[in-house]
A protein has these predicted regions:
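Cytosolic regulatory regions of ion transport systems
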Residues: 1-168
């Protein structure tokens, strides 16, 4: 019985330490409370996003812009350490649904240079619908401001015209 309790306590301790480290890592990537403008906003997360970030932050790109990732499950956003790969030095995370206008305001979408909306792979056949809703939400947030460029990933070509009408 003592052995079982000891193993349980060790597991609890390890889980607590891991949770603290993950939370600290996520906090270091929160959007700073400064006026950010001209940045890139990436809505939704997928492994394809890593290559996209590497491309926009590559050494051949002279116009370096910070990247703000908006995703409802930040634990899924797995980024290389800032010290290991320079492309990820200026990458921040906003937790929340990218179709939610409050969350988009927190990501400072109205001041963004461009917004890239990736298809949410978890939505399967409804991914394009969610992408269209995200496009509309971005337009609504930016109604008084200059509209950022909106680029949206379309999985089914039959929804392409709907995405264009939504602002992509």
């Amino acid at each position: 019985a003592v052995l079982v309790v000891g193993v349980a306590l060790a597991g609890l301790f390890t889980a607590s330490v891991a949770s603290i480290l993950i939370e600290r890592s996520l906090r270091s990537r929160e959007v700073p409370n400064i006026e950010m403008s001209g940045h890139l906003v990436l809505c939704n997360w997928s492994p394809r996003a890593l290559d996209w970030i590497r491309e926009v932050h590559s050494s051949i790109v002279t116009d370096h812009r910070p990247v703000v990732i908006v995703h409802d499950t930040p634990d899924e956003v797995v980024l290389p350490d800032k010290l290991d790969e320079a492309a990820f030095n200026d990458v921040y995370i906003v937790k929340g649904d990218p179709a939610n206008e409050v969350i988009l305001r927190r990501a400072k979408v109205a001041q963004a240079y461009s917004v890239v909306i990736l298809a949410d792979d978890r939505q399967e056949r409804h991914a394009d619908g969610k992408t269209i809703v995200c496009c509309i939400a971005v337009k609504n947030v930016c109604v008084q401001e200059r509209q950022p460029n909106i680029v949206a990933e379309c999985q089914d070509p039959k929804y392409r015209q709907h995405m264009r009408k939504a602002g992509a």
